[in-house]
UniProtKB/Swiss-Prot annotation:
It is a multi-pass membrane protein. This is Transmembrane protein 134. Belongs to the TMEM134/TMEM230 family. Residues 60-91 are annotated as: Disordered. It is found in: Membrane; Cytoplasm, Perinuclear region. Residues 1-122, 176-195 are cytoplasmic. It comes from Bos taurus. GO terms for cellular component: membrane; perinuclear region of cytoplasm.
Length: 195
C-alpha cells in the first residue's frame, strides 16, 4: 500500500491546488509558496519616530499663532516670528503638566468608558454594591468581636459578609482585567453581561 502512494511531507502542506494557477508555478505544475520573510525594524528607529511624532503634536499645541516651531535641545520650542527667536519653555512645561494629568486621569478612569461597561452599567454597579456590602458586614462582625454585645453573635455578620464579598471581588477584578485586556479575561465568560 505504501509503495502505490507517495509519502506526505511538510512541503506538501504548502502546495496550492491545481485550480490555483498563478505566476509561481514550478516545472512540475505545482505552485508553491515562497519562504516567509519578516521585516524587523530596529528599536531606535521606532523610538525616533515616536519621539518625532510626540514633538510634532506638542509643537502644534504650543504654536497658537501659526509660527513654525522646531524642538530645541534644552526641551524648549523655538519659533520664528518674522526674524525674532523666542523660547517657549514655560508654555512647553505647562502643556506637559496638563497632558500628564490628563494621562493619569485616563489611566485611572478609562475603563469606565468601555462600551460594554456603559452598556452593562447595572451589572457593574451591582458588583461594586456586593463588594461594599460584604466589606461593611465583615467590618461589623469584627466590631462585634472586639466589643461583644450580649445576644448578638458576630457570625450573623461574618457569614453574609463573606457570601457577598467573594462574588463582588471576583466580578470587580474580572471586569477590570477584561477591560484592560489581560490574557484570559473576556466579557464572554461573564453570563450577566450583554455582548
Amino acid at each position: 500500500m505504501s509503495a502505490s502512494r507517495p509519502q506526505f511531507s511538510i512541503d506538501d502542506a504548502f502546495e496550492l491546488s491545481l485550480e490555483d494557477t498563478g505566476p509561481g508555478l514550478e516545472p512540475s505544475g505545482v505552485a508553491r509558496f515562497g519562504p516567509l520573510h519578516f521585516e524587523r525594524r530596529a528599536r531606535f528607529e521606532v523610538a525616533d519616530e515616536d519621539k518625532q511624532s510626540r514633538l510634532r503634536y506638542q509643537n502644534l499645541e504650543n504654536d497658537e499663532d501659526g509660527a513654525q516651531a522646531s524642538p530645541e535641545p534644552d526641551g524648549g520650542v523655538s519659533s520664528r516670528d518674522s526674524g525674532q527667536t523666542s523660547i517657549r519653555s514655560s508654555q512647553w512645561s505647562f502643556s506637559s503638566i496638563s497632558s500628564s494629568t490628563q494621562r493619569s486621569y485616563n489611566a485611572c478612569c478609562s475603563w469606565t468608558q468601555h462600551p460594554l461597561i456603559q452598556k452593562n452599567h447595572r451589572v457593574v454597579l451591582a458588583s461594586f454594591l456586593l463588594l461594599l456590602l460584604g466589606l461593611v458586614l465583615i467590618l461589623t462582625g469584627v466590631g462585634l468581636e472586639v466589643a461583644p454585645s450580649p445576644g448578638v453573635s458576630s457570625a450573623i455578620f461574618f457569614v453574609p459578609g463573606f457570601l457577598l464579598l467573594v462574588p463582588g471581588v471576583y466580578h470587580v477584578i474580572f471586569i477590570y482585567c477584561a477591560v484592560k485586556g489581560h490574557r484570559g479575561f473576556q466579557f464572554f465568560y461573564l453570563p450577566y453581561f450583554e455582548k
